[in-house]
Structure formats: structure tokens, C-alpha cells
């Protein structure tokens, strides 16, 4: 599955008339929280994301971040690879499907997921399926653009996880873009965070710089 999809994506990018863009971001997080669970033991983390997107809707990308897990002194880096297709149905509706592989240094095992995301206006629903364990994760979010206008970004997120030992969670995220072409973004997220097996309320912040270049 992985080799077939990556081969298809790479073949798309070798088309002579191919046009698209390179985009991504680099950022600093006061806590790296993923699906309601800290991946850095509540400590700061630096991340990078880069993506090549074709005008046809196909894309490939990578995500890298610092991680730290309780009882594991060997794992410090996460590097993910993903590929997919984003179908723009209309100005307000899109369907994104793809594959992602999560890899770590140290002793943490890599794993793979398939995902599908539906965006309708401010609503977004995404479902991930673990290829090896058949576990599923779903996330529903809504952006309150009509309420806050261009003053700042306001987003409500609810995650549902059927992985044993994992809880559902809810987060409220407030963000603001600034600087030249609004390339910088600062956000604060309030919600639940699982740390060493205990769930508690948490607040964490992120500062990112976004970039893009067409070709």
C-alpha cells in the first residue's frame, strides 16, 4: 500500500507540464500535544512541516518534531511522511484522502494510517485508520469565522479515539496571524492533555512561520 501510493504521487510530479507549489511551516510549541496526549512530556518542542502540492490536487509532505516520552531516553525525534489527494468540490467543499507513516528514532515503533477528511464551510471531519491494528481516530472541528471575522481565528476541536486507554477530548484554539503577508501565527489552545496516564486541563501555545512558493 505504502509503495504503491508513494510511487503514484512521485509519478505525478514528473509530468513535464507539472505546476504547483512548495509550502509549509516551522514553529515552536510550548507543549507538543497530539490527539489530546502530550508527545513531549509537557516540554517545549520545535517542529517543521514541508509539502509539495500539485495544481491537480496531489501532494506529498513530511512533518518533523522533537518528542520525549516517559521512561524512554532513546526517542527524541518524530519524522512523518504522507501523500494524498485533495479534491476541491466547490469553494466551500473539499475532500482530502491520503496515507501517512509515523516514524521515530529510538525504541518507539513506526506505524501507518489511512485518512479521509471532509471540509464543508467552517466544519471539518477527519477519520484516521491504523493499517496494522485497525484502531480508528476521528476529529470534528468548527471555525467560527462568522463570529470573529478577521480579528482572530477561533476553532473548536473534539477528538474521538477508540484506542484502548485513550480518552476523547475537547479543545478550544484561539489564533492570530500577523507580519508580512500574515506569515506568522500565534495560537493558544485550551483543553485536556494526557500526561503520564493522567488527564488534566491544559493550556499550550504555538508560534509558527508559514512559507509558500509556486513553480
Task: Describe each model-derived feature in a short phrase.
Residues 16-215:
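Outer-membrane beta-barrel proteins
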Amino acid at each position: 500500500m505504502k509503495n504503491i501510493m508513494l510511487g503514484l504521487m512521485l509519478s505525478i510530479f514528473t509530468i513535464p507540464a507539472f505546476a504547483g507549489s512548495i509550502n509549509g511551516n516551522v514553529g515552536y510549541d510550548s507543549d507538543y500535544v497530539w490527539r489530546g496526549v502530550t508527545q513531549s512530556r509537557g516540554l517545549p518542542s520545535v517542529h517543521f512541516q514541508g509539502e509539495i502540492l500539485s495544481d491537480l490536487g496531489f501532494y506529498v509532505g513530511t512533518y518533523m518534531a522533537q518528542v520525549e516520552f516517559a521512561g524512554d531516553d532513546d526517542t527524541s525525534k518524530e519524522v512523518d511522511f504522507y501523500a494524498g489527494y485533495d479534491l476541491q468540490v466547490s469553494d466551500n467543499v473539499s475532500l482530502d484522502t491520503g496515507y501517512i507513516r509515523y516514524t521515530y528514532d529510538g525504541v518507539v515503533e513506526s506505524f501507518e494510517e489511512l485518512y479521509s477528511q471532509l471540509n464543508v464551510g467552517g466544519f471539518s471531519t477527519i477519520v484516521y485508520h491504523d493499517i496494522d491494528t485497525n484502531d480508528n481516530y476521528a476529529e470534528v472541528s468548527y471555525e467560527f469565522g462568522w463570529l470573529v471575522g478577521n480579528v482572530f481565528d477561533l476553532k473548536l476541536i473534539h477528538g474521538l479515539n477508540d484506542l484502548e486507554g485513550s480518552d476523547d477530548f475537547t479543545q478550544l484554539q484561539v489564533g492570530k496571524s500577523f507580519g508580512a503577508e500574515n506569515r506568522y501565527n500565534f495560537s493558544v489552545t485550551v483543553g485536556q492533555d494526557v500526561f503520564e496516564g493522567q488527564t488534566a486541563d491544559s493550556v499550550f501555545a504555538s508560534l509558527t512561520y508559514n512559507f509558500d512558493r509556486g513553480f
